[in-house]
């Protein structure tokens, strides 16, 4: 069971073998009841739940605690990329203890950055932000602020990439043109030749 946002991400999770998807998002966090309904619909003795948002982990844990007839394993994924990485690490032949260990190790190495618009003037992490500015938000705060989406995206990635980075995955929403995403991918390939860039 995975929480997902949007059609594109839902397709990715389906391709990775997720049996049941719950629509989520910043303003619509699934409840414990939503989780229990999903658990009831999945015909399996062991069910893995990927919350993919730190605000949903509690609901998933409560659903696990309220379920007695199935083994529920909550993988504490806090972002969609962590959820995707955890699913890729899943091996059906392994038991739940082996799988959770592999998944936890895998998500430990995932860094997530998001590019979004500022909805109001504010000051966060010593950065002056104005309504309409582009912001690059990482796992631990604001990484970049600016007027140009492409430049903010590049700076956000620059703040996250280190010597251990191997793969840079770009997921883009409906309001981003494919050509713009391809331009970013090309720029990142040139800037980080030791990393695989996926679009």
How does the language model describe each region?
Residues 1-199:
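N-terminal loops that bind phosphate or other acidic moieties
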């Amino acid at each position: 069971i995975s929480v997902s946002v949007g059609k594109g991400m839902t397709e990715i999770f389906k391709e990775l073998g997720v049996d049941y998807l719950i629509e989520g998002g910043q303003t619509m966090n699934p409840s414990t009841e939503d989780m229990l309904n999903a658990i009831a619909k999945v015909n399996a003795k062991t069910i893995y739940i990927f919350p993919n948002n730190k605000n949903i982990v509690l609901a998933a844990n409560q659903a696990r605690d309220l379920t007695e007839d199935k083994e529920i394993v909550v993988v504490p994924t806090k972002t969609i990329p962590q959820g995707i990485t955890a699913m890729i690490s899943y091996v059906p032949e392994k038991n739940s203890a082996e799988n959770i260990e592999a998944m936890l190790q895998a998500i430990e190495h995932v860094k997530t950055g998001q590019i979004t618009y500022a909805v109001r003037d504010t000051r966060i992490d010593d950065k002056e932000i104005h309504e309409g500015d582009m912001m690059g938000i990482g796992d631990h705060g604001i990484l970049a602020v600016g007027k140009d989406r492409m430049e903010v995206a590049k700076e956000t990635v620059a703040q996250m990439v280190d010597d251990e980075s191997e793969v840079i995955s770009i997921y883009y929403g409906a309001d981003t043109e494919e050509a713009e995403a391809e331009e970013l991918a090309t720029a990142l390939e040139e800037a980080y030749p030791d990393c695989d860039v996926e679009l």
